Each structure stands twice: as structure tokens, then as C-alpha cells.
Amino acid sequence: MVLEKLKEENTVIALIGASNDKQKYGNKIYCDLRSKGYNVVPINPKEKLIEGDKAYTSIEEMESLPDIANFVVPPPVAMKITPHISELGIKHLWFQPGSESKELETWLKNTEGIKYLINSCIMVETR
């Protein structure tokens, strides 16, 4: 279901953990999706710009909610913010390899209405 949402026209992706550090996947994923024409919005509480584009400190700052939240953050951060993001009404969640945990997987399985991908790289899926 998340892959289908990704293929819809005008889908907005919030990249939680976007980074200016070219060595980090938060930067690689952001640049990759942007180069492929995806509407990707960088989320990072410590940055004002990511690759010259306005970065938001949180999803709530965005002008409208994204269709997909893509996580490229450590597992404790993903677990901490996922319930809140779900409560906002974002139901398509994508967890990059390394952002998941057993606790998160259990929460996702026990939460109705959430469509999610774990251990699947968005750069690979969009080739």
C-alpha cells in the first residue's frame, strides 16, 4: 500500500532525518528522490536549509501534511515520534533500513489504519 501511494501523482514525502551531511543517508535519499522528480520535504529540527531547500523542524510546520512519512533516523527517535505522526493523520509510513526496532514493529502491527514498510530502501524502490 505504501508503494502504491508513492506511485500516485503529486505524492508528498516528508523525509524525517534529512541532512546536509553528504555521508549520511538523510542527504543521499533527499538528493536521490529530488533528482527523480519526487516532491520530498526535508524534516530536521537542527537545520534551516537542506541542500538549499527550506527544511522544517517538524511535520506540523509543513503547509499541509505529507502523504508519506519516510524515516531515516535512529530507532529510538523513530519509536518516539511515530505514534504522534500517526495521530496527525499520516497513515503511510516508510522506515529506512536501520530506523526500525522490535518495539516499533510491535507498535505498527498493533495499530489499526497504518500502512507501513520496514527494511525497504526508497532509493532502491524508486529505481
Q: What kind of region is each of these model predictions?
A:
Residues 97-125:
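Rossmann-fold NAD(P)-binding glycine/threonine-rich loop
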Residues 59, 63-99:
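Mid-chain, well-packed structural core segment of small domains
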Residues 38, 88-92, 111-114:
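A short helix->loop->beta-strand "cap" motif at the edges of active sites that frequently abuts
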